[in-house]
Curated annotation (Swiss-Prot):
This is Synaptic vesicle glycoprotein 2C. It is a multi-pass membrane protein. PANTHER family: SYNAPTIC VESICLE GLYCOPROTEIN 2, SYNAPTIC VESICLE GLYCOPROTEIN 2C. The modification Phosphotyrosine is found at Y466. The lineage of its organism: Eukaryota, Metazoa, Chordata, Craniata, Vertebrata. The gene is Sv2c. Residues 176-191, 248, 302-320, 459-578, 631-636, 694-697 are extracellular. The modification Phosphoserine is found at S75, S76. The keyword Membrane applies. Its main location: membrane. Plays a role in the control of regulated secretion in neural and endocrine cells, enhancing selectively low-frequency neurotransmission. Positively regulates vesicle fusion by maintaining the readily releasable pool of secretory vesicles. (Microbial infection) Receptor for C.botulinum neurotoxin type A (BoNT/A, botA); the toxin binds Sv2c via extracellular loop 4. Restores uptake of BoNT/A in rat cells that are deleted for SV2 receptor.
Length: 727
């Protein structure tokens, strides 16, 4: 009886030991990630698990636990870093726990229900809690990785993409005068070239920003920059105006995704104390793009000797060389971007724990090697990942034909982008989105509107000065003459020309009014801004001229002949003073941004984003009133430089605030929407301010000042993100 009792006691103790060991191992594996997040920065060793286990283990006298005898049989890559006593090496990656762990076990009373039994509201609540925990942990991880070689390498790669965006904004304005003559652009269609690029950038910003939240920052940026580079390069070779417009539209569509994706990408590898300053330094590349475009235009476009032709049908002039050179920053960014990893913050957001861990370890090791500390170990081995909520259904391979599957896939992705965009107006970011919309619209409307108004005013002042130098010839008579020189800036009124020959003459800004031409010959004549108003031509021969019908206004022809008229569009024989002046003014205006960039970068984390945003916009609005005193070209250029220098701080702080206010799952989408709104406001500002150039100064000044001050006051009401972790 006593032996039977001892056997039962020994059996019960053995069963209890086995159950206790199974329970402890399960609890230890489930809670290991939480313990690591709490202890990794205290450098505590995880051998404490074994020590605690040993204190609680019970083995009957004379018996020992032999469950470790076959441990090697269950080893795998996921368990590397464990010794025979199951001690975890510091910094060794343990792999992400299975999402199905514990799901298939028996559900006891009081056990939490599985995801399949929860409604969407519960799942979203759990996801928000996971995201908050991840945000705090990710900030600690980025701080451990440090700021060094990796961030600087990514800084220059993304800077090239941002530089390409700056070039795209300037390139159309620089090539427009030459492209108008080379592509036979009518006056009614010249405005389309500037607007079509902004239209493409507006659509592209929204699309690529949304795609970056779906497929990743790197992939979206690679695709959009490739689209921009390809069509920008192609536009330099097309001959027709329609094809040129299409190429610039698609080029703008591609580059539209650069700004929202670049800032989202770079912000996600920066620690909180570095974010404001280094995002501001990144903004400097946009200015560098403007300087690059201005300098290249100044150096290339006026040099017609760089041109070549292949027959009369294909003309490759210097402005096309300029377009190719402007595509180089985009090509460079695409090549360099292929060597950079995806944003680890995005990967964690979509549940790709292992890939994110490897990239974070790469960042840590790269920075530590650059510091001369290669022995320093990356101590993180578990990172919180938000609960994934399936929204879209994967398309099966047998769903109709290939093009139907492609169409359904595109439609599904677009619908997903739209859903993400609508979530930008949900709690808790709805109020911030509305305020940011107002600030982005007002700043863009005022900045781009006045940016167009300044050059037009300078051009208007130049025209007034040019008109004062006009030579007026009235009621005179010339007979039996021959002219073979250039005639410029003249008005001939009530003149009579009898038996005259115009041989190889270049007419530049010449107008003939109420004049009579008898038995005259125009041979090999070219003209720019030259018109015949209410003139009479009798027995006159026009041979090899570029006189189009629109140059004869209310004129009469009697027994006249037009032979071998020049075909195609003739390159203007301007002395290039105006071209040099335009490039020089843009160069100075862009260079004036440099001090503002430096100041904003140094003070962004000291005085705060909101103070800089509101203060810069209010000061820019006040500076508009100095335009009352701009009565000369030099004074207007000075005002332009002052205005650009003040507004750049507002742009930099607005970029930083926008990135920090949106969570990771909709950061690029929200930024893309606001950037698209920015382009729409720019087009509206160009139209309104451009129509007021020759009317009055009062309306543009008051309109720009009011808009900027109101936007600055709204910007001061945004939340301060200086001490906030990136959600």
């Amino acid at each position: 009886m006593e032996d039977s009792y001892k056997d039962r006691t020994s059996l019960m103790k053995g069963a209890k030991d086995i159950a206790k060991e199974v329970k402890k191992q399960t609890v230890k594996k489930v809670n290991q990630a939480v313990d690591r997040a709490q202890d990794e920065y205290t450098q505590r060793s995880y051998s404490r698990f074994q020590d605690e286990d040993d204190d609680d283990d019970y083995y009957p006298p004379g018996e020992t636990y032999s469950g470790e005898a076959n441990d090697d049989e269950g080893s795998s890559e996921a368990t590397e870093g464990h010794d025979e006593e199951d001690e975890i090496y510091e910094g060794e990656y343990q792999g992400i726990p299975s999402t199905n762990q514990g799901k298939d076990s028996i559900v006891s009373v009081g056990q939490p229900k599985g995801d399949e039994y929860k409604d969407r509201r519960e799942l979203e609540s759990e996801r928000r809690a996971d995201e908050e925990e991840l945000a705090q942990q990710y900030e600690l991880i980025i701080q451990e990785c440090g700021h060094g070689r990796f961030q600087w390498a990514l800084f220059f790669v993304l800077g090239m993409a941002l530089m390409a965006d700056g070039v795209e904004v300037f390139v159309v304005g620089f090539v427009l005068p030459s492209a108008e003559t080379d592509l036979c652009i009518p006056n009614s269609g010249s405005g389309w070239l500037g607007s079509i690029v902004y239209l493409g950038m507006m659509v592209g910003a929204f699309f690529w920003g949304g795609l970056a939240d779906k497929v990743g920052r790197k992939q979206s940026l690679l695709i959009c920059m490739s689209v921009n580079g390809f069509f920008a390069f192609l536009s330099s070779f097309v001959q027709g105006y329609g094809f040129f417009l299409l190429c610039r539209l698609l080029s703008g569509f591609g580059i539209g995704g650069a700004i929202p994706t670049v800032f989202s990408y770079f912000a996600e590898v920066l620690a909180r104390e570095k974010r404001g300053e280094h995002l501001s330094w990144l903004c400097m590349f946009w200015m560098i793009g403007g300087i690059y475009a201005s300098a290249m235009a100044w150096a290339i476009i006026p040099h017609y000797g760089w041109s070549f032709s292949m027959g009369s049908a294909y003309q490759f002039h210097s402005w096309r060389v300029f377009v190719i050179v402007c595509a180089l920053p985009c090509v460079s960014s695409v090549v360099a971007l292929t060597f950079m990893p995806e944003s680890p913050r995005f990967l964690l957001e979509v549940g790709k724990h292992d890939e994110a861990w490897m990239i974070l370890k790469l960042i840590h090791d790269t920075n530590m090697r650059a510091r001369g500390q290669p022995e320093k170990v990356f101590t993180v081995n578990k990172i919180k990942t938000p609960k994934q909520i399936d929204e879209l259904i994967e398309i099966e391979s047998d769903t109709g034909t290939w093009y139907r599957r492609c169409f359904v896939r595109i439609r599904t992705e677009l619908y997903g982008i739209w859903l993400t965009f609508m979530r930008c107006f949900n709690y808790p970011v709805r109020e911030n989105t509305i305020k940011l919309t107002i600030v982005w619209f007002t700043l863009s409307f005022g900045y781009y509107g006045l940016s167009v108004w300044f050059p037009d005013v300078i051009k208007h002042l130049q025209s007034d000065e040019y008109a004062l130098l006009t030579r007026n010839v009235q009621k005179d008579k010339y007979a039996n003459f021959s002219i073979n020189f250039t005639m410029e800036n003249q008005v001939h009124t009530g003149m009579e020309y009898d038996n005259g020959r115009f041989l190889g003459v270049k007419f530049k800004s010449v107008t003939f009014k109420d004049s009579v031409f008898k038995s005259c010959t125009f041979d090999d004549v070219t003209s720019v801004n030259t018109y015949f108003k209410n003139c009479t031509f009798i027995d006159t021969l026009f041979e090899n001229t570029d006189f189009e019908p629109y140059k004869f206004i209310d004129s009469e022809f009697q027994n006249c002949s037009f032979l071998h008229n020049k075909t195609g569009c003739q390159i203007t024989f301007d002395d290039d003073y105006s071209a040099y002046w335009i490039y020089f003014v843009n160069f100075l205006g862009t260079l004036a941004v440099l001090p503002g960039n430096i100041v904003s970068a140094l003070l962004m984390d000291r005085i705060g984003r909101l103070t800089m945003l509101g203060g810069s916009m209010v000061l820019s609005g006040i500076s508009c009133f100095f335009l009352w005193f701009g009565t000369s070209e030099s004074m207007m250029i000075g005002m332009l430089c002052l205005y650009n220098g003040l507004t750049i701080s507002a742009w930099n702080s607005l970029d930083v605030v926008t990135v920090e206010l949106y969570p990771t799952d909709r950061r690029a989408t929200g930024f893309g929407f606001l950037n698209a709104l920015c382009k729409a406001a720019a087009v509206l500002g160009n139209l309104i301010f451009g129509s007021l150039v020759s009317i009055t100064k009062a309306i543009p000044i008051l309109l720009a000042s009011t808009v900027l001050v109101c936007g600055g006051l709204v910007g001061l009401r945004l939340p301060d993100t200086r001490t906030q972790v990136l959600m």
